[in-house]
Swiss-Prot record:
Keyword match Cell wall biogenesis/degradation: no
EC class (word): transferase
Signal peptide: none
Protein name: Glucokinase
Stored NCBIfam families: glk (TIGR00749)
Organism: Xanthomonas campestris pv. campestris (strain B100)
Binding-site list for ATP: 11-16
Keyword ATP-binding attached: yes
Pfam families in the cross-refs: Glucokinase
Length: 335
């Protein structure tokens, strides 16, 4: 590995794992893949300790950093969802000897990654094709990702700058589109009261859909995890297969609604750990039909690309993109 002259430490911090890499902001491909490392967060008392361990292991001293964290960033502080770490930007920067340290939400990083994605990093899910555009060309993108929950955001590109749009769109109320979905909503309403999109389109959402379909059929499926449903569907189980089909159709409807709400006419990127597991189903299900089925806007929606992100380190890529964009900021601009 040849370290860049001014390396930036980038990180993608979740509740279980911490991923680190170096970025070269002057390179055409800023994320240095051969520097990527992953550690269990339980092995360290703080993010600063984990970052210092990584830098010592790789033998490089960075002076700047961009850390994407799975939790809310509030000024100088970030809290990791499902982990007791409370991160202070200023204290962590001092501990590492950094002149600059940015803390960003992990889904903001997923959105920023769009600016560096290449055609080989995505798989088209029906509809129109997509090619990266020059950074100087205005673009509006949407990003949606089912995992433990449902992340929804966007990326606005203007005048060579990238602006991630952070939202809580996963908590928008679920709008059923068929009689079957109305019945599913009724069943889930008995359990949760208000039913958001996240109650269906995420890993636990697969279980919720399967449980509702089982109740409609008068069957008790017993305790299940998302991986059990995908495995049963792959083995040809009819109810599990219907669960996946319904998941994909609802996912498409919600992703299409996001385009209308955000004006994300240049494409929607599907991210998260669940997408690769159901990719084949997405491509051969009602995802795209429901994505496009938007009344008077159906013709326009047919021209909006929908793309599954397959890059193995999209969070790190997004942190690297943020570092690159920060260098484009004019003196006095906030980033």
């Amino acid at each position: 590995m040849t370290a860049p002259s001014k390396p930036v430490l980038v990180a993608d911090i979740g509740g279980t794992n911490a991923r680190f890499a170096l970025a070269d902001i002057d390179a055409s491909v800023p994320l240095l893949d051969d520097t990527c490392r992953e550690f269990a967060v339980v092995e360290f008392g703080s993010l600063g300790e984990a970052a210092r361990y990584y830098l010592d292991q790789i033998g490089v001293q960075a002076t700047k950093g961009v850390f994407a964290v799975a939790g809310r960033v509030d000024g100088d502080e970030a809290r990791i969802t499902n982990h007791p770490w409370v991160i202070s930007r200023s204290r962590t920067a001092t501990m590492l000897g950094f002149s600059t340290l940015h803390l960003i939400n992990d889904f903001a990083a997923q959105a920023m990654a769009i600016s560096l994605l290449r055609p080989q990093d995505v798989v088209q899910v029906g509809g129109a094709s997509w090619r990266p555009a020059p950074i100087e060309q205005p673009r509006n993108y949407g990003v949606i990702g089912p995992g433990t929950g449902l992340g929804v955001g966007g990326l606005i590109i203007r005048n060579g700058r990238c602006f991630p749009l952070e939202t809580e769109g996963g908590h928008v109320s679920f709008p059923p589109g068929t009689p079957e979905e109305i019945r599913v909503l009724e069943i889930l309403s008995e359990q949760f009261g208000r039913v958001s999109n996240e109650r269906l389109i995420c890993g636990p959402g697969l279980v919720n859909i399967h449980r509702a379909l089982s109740e409609i059929a008068g069957i008790d499926p017993g305790p299940l995890e998302p991986k059990d449903i995908t495995a049963r569907a792959a083995a040809g189980d009819p109810r599990a297969s219907r669960t996946i089909d319904l998941f994909c159709a609802i996912f498409g409807a919600i992703a299409g609604d996001m385009v209308l709400m955000q004006g994300a006419w240049d494409g929607v990127f599907l991210t998260g750990g669940l997408v690769p597991k159901v990719l084949d189903s997405l491509q051969h299900s009602g995802f795209r039909q429901r994505f496009e089925h938007k009344g008077r806007f159906s013709a326009i929606m047919s021209r909006v690309p929908s793309l599954a992100v397959m890059h193995p380190h999209a969070g790190l890529l997004g942190a690297a993109a943020y570092a690159v964009d920060a260098e484009r900021a004019l003196p006095g601009e906030q980033r």
